[in-house]
A protein has these predicted regions:
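Bacterial N-terminal signal peptides
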Residues: 7-17
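Positively charged n-region of N-terminal signal peptides that target proteins for export
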Residues: 1-4
Length: 241
């Protein structure tokens, strides 16, 4: 009878052991078509995306992307993360998708140029501002998320222009963005807990001659991946396809 009870108990407990414990962030890796943590447990990600933009957050922490609002912005997200990952209140998020909001990375003193509109226009992008606010704002927000048991996926500032061509300005922009992000020691130390989303919403990708090609997507994104890996980032990279 005792042996039968133990056998039944093992059968009941076994499936739960195959999945990671909720609220525990252990570095992830790809295993076939699954995500596994460092202990071999399957991990299913479900969460939310937000951008530290005053406008899209209804000015709850300030009215501008300026230094005097950094502390309030980080505190706001700390509270949000506490609500997103709170099983006692019925919330079970385990990942936060962090947009590197271009309101912080764009130079307010630059004039917008080019034909691309909205967040697809990168003419005001400032590498020095990305470097500054990566350390001062974005990564502190990411750390707050991790403290609350959330994985973090980081996406680049803005969205892709409608038409991309191998060797174009946007490809070079992605190389610059991810070179800065992936060379950061905090990001590398949190590889697996933090993952990188290479680009957002590409529509058309052409080869260097402006033609449709089966290899255009590979030729466009592989050089960006190479930059990231060369810097020593070993975590998951999400590549649009």
């Amino acid at each position: 009878m005792k042996k039968r009870f133990l056998a039944i108990l093992a059968a009941v407990l076994l499936p739960s052991c195959l999945f990671a414990q909720f609220g525990v962030v252990s570095p992830l890796h790809v295993n076939g078509n699954q995500l596994n943590d460092a202990y071999g447990n399957k991990v299913v990600l479900h969460g939310v995306m937000d951008t530290p933009s005053p406008y899209f957050n209804k000015y709850r922490w300030g009215y501008s992307c300026t230094d005097n609002n950094i502390s309030a912005c980080i505190s706001y997200y700390d509270k949000i993360f506490g609500a997103l990952q709170n099983p006692a209140k019925g919330t079970y998020c385990n990942i936060f998708r962090l947009h590197l909001e271009p309101g912080w990375t764009n130079d307010p003193n630059k004039k917008s140029t080019g034909s691309d509109t909205g967040e697809a226009n990168i003419s005001r992008f400032s590498a020095s501002r990305l470097q500054k606010y990566l350390d001062a704002l974005y990564l502190p927000i990411a750390q707050k998320a991790i403290n609350h048991g959330l994985y973090v996926v980081i996406r680049p500032p803005g969205v892709c222009p409608k038409d991309l061509k191998v060797g174009d300005a946007y490809q070079n922009y992605l190389k610059t963005v991810w070179n800065i992000v992936s060379s950061n020691s905090w990001v590398k130390n949190n590889s697996g807990i933090v993952s990188l989303e290479l680009a957002n919403e590409p529509v058309h990708i052409y080869n260097r001659y402006g033609q449709s090609s089966a290899t255009a997507m590979r030729d466009y994104f592989q050089p960006v991946v190479d930059v990231i890996r060369k810097n020593g980032f070993k975590g998951i990279i999400w590549i649009p396809g």
